[in-house]
Amino acid sequence: MTNPVRWLFSTNHKDIGTLYFIFGAIAGVMGTCFSVLIRMELARPGDQILGGNHQLYNVLITAHAFFMIFFMVMPAMIGGSGNWSVPILIGAPDMAFPRLNNISFWLLPPSLLLLLSSALVEVGSGTGWTVYPPLSGITSHSGGAVDSAISSLHLSGVSSILGSINFLTTISNMRGPGMTMHRSPLFVWSVPVTAFPLLLSLPVLAGAITMLLTDRNFNTTFSDPAGGGDPILYQHLFRFFGHPEVYIPILPGSGIISHIVSTFSGKPVFGYLGMVYAMISIGVLGFLVWAHHMFTVGLDVDTRAYFTAATMIIAVPTGIKIFSWIATMWGGSIQYKTPMLFAVGFIFLFTIGGLTGIVPANSGLDIALHDTYYVVAHFHYVLSMGAVFALFAGFHYWVGKIFGRTYPETLGKIHFWITFFGVNLTLFPMHFLGLSGMPRRIPDYPDAYAGWNALSSFGSYISVVGIRRFFVVVTITSSSGNNITRANIPWAVEQNSTTLEWLVQSPPAFHTFGELPAIKETKSYVK
């Protein structure tokens, strides 16, 4: 365990998954620190801790978004959970391309360092995560900060593309004998449905930010109307990537939630095939709705009508998933252990996030709500309470498999309730701020907004206490939890017979399967 060479050159999927988790935890703590600094600045009207440095405020906003999306949620959800679980769940000895797996991870730390360094160059990169021109152009952001951030995005994108190729190949070609796709758990389905959109959308982002790079450094005018360019072109290219990107962390999360709800309800997932097709539909529809982020840029009325309708259609497969989870729990013998609490919390909060998303999907209403705190509240309910709660649920569910020890149940539940209360107190008041017209990315505001902002900032401090409790749980589990034996499987219910991970020892051997398991049982999800 302590040999650095083993970790640096490892081609073992479990080692690399662990590295992804550690990296995601570090980036998550840093991103949380940025968000708390933002909330401290917004706790009261007027200039607070940043002393009137509004560029620094925008640098914090940008860093918070990049850290949380590209360096926390995606590495932990796809790299961590995917690497650890997918080969075991499909009965594969390892990933298809182990050395590619290694470089996929090791591209991320330099990418993170590039992003950090961008904040230290001149005035930093204060563009927001969208990096829209002309704000990101050479006249508004001279110096190397934005170039450094763009290079960071390129590295992160290459990492994701290589990882996606690896997962698609592994799941296509390396399933154990008898493990058909229709026998695979929903988490296994969610990974290729996530990898395809990544593979298709990341090159578009790469093209967009490369155009931006040449505009800044080589005097091209892709985004400058003076030379025949158009800043709206960049918005279309970025959002073509950016919208699938926000579904990408949610899909593996929904696979994890399906796994957990099924186990703790003691029943197979309700409507397995419907769940699969719903995931595929979300993956496809995610590419057809990007301009709903652009209702205010002057699109013609027919275009806005189409994107309004297409955005609302995404609610259908999402609703199928939510009702299937509820139907799975209906009449089940439910055990409210920590993973199940996070799963139920996910379903409740993800539903709220989905409902609040239907409102700005209307292009007419979005004229009023665009770039207000209503939008911030909506996507944080989906991401901060969707993806992150799914990660916490999956961690508590599989931590016994990873460490070979049980986590402290009471501390896990305390972690859930503090976090649940904190994030709701932080984000729910933002709906009211947005409906009142408070714009995003602004470090100061009129006194009328002071009450809800104070409440929101207080909630963010509570969330930090909850996250600290999470690291206490991790420390106790890794150092002094009870050992798990074959006879002491933490979730010993009949439903586990449909997945392979509890049939191997905890923690699994360095090479999980001495010989490939033959899947012979007839209780496949689809007859």
UniProtKB/Swiss-Prot annotation:
Cofactor: heme; Cu cation
Gene Ontology cellular component list: mitochondrial inner membrane; respiratory chain complex IV
Keywords, alphabetical: Calcium, Copper, Electron transport, Heme, Iron, Magnesium, Membrane, Metal-binding, Mitochondrion, Mitochondrion inner membrane, Respiratory chain, Translocase, Transmembrane, Transmembrane helix, Transport
Positions bound to Cu cation: H243, H292, H293
Binding site for Mg(2+): H370, D371
Pathway(s) annotated for this protein in UniProt: Energy metabolism; oxidative phosphorylation
InterPro entries for the chain: Cyt_c_oxase-like_su1_dom (IPR023616), Cyt_c_oxase-like_su1_sf (IPR036927), Cyt_C_Oxase_1 (IPR000883), Cyt_c_oxase_su1_dom (IPR033944)
Top-level taxon of origin: Eukaryota
One GO process term, biological-process aspect: mitochondrial electron transport, cytochrome c to oxygen
Residues noted as binding Fe(II)-heme a in the record, renumbered to the chain: H64, H380
Catalytic activity entry: 4 Fe(II)-[cytochrome c] + O2 + 8 H(+)(in) = 4 Fe(III)-[cytochrome c] + 2 H2O + 4 H(+)(out)
Molecular-function GO terms, alphabetical: cytochrome-c oxidase activity; heme binding; metal ion binding
Protein name, UniProt field: Cytochrome c oxidase subunit 1
Species, as recorded: Pisum sativum (Garden pea)
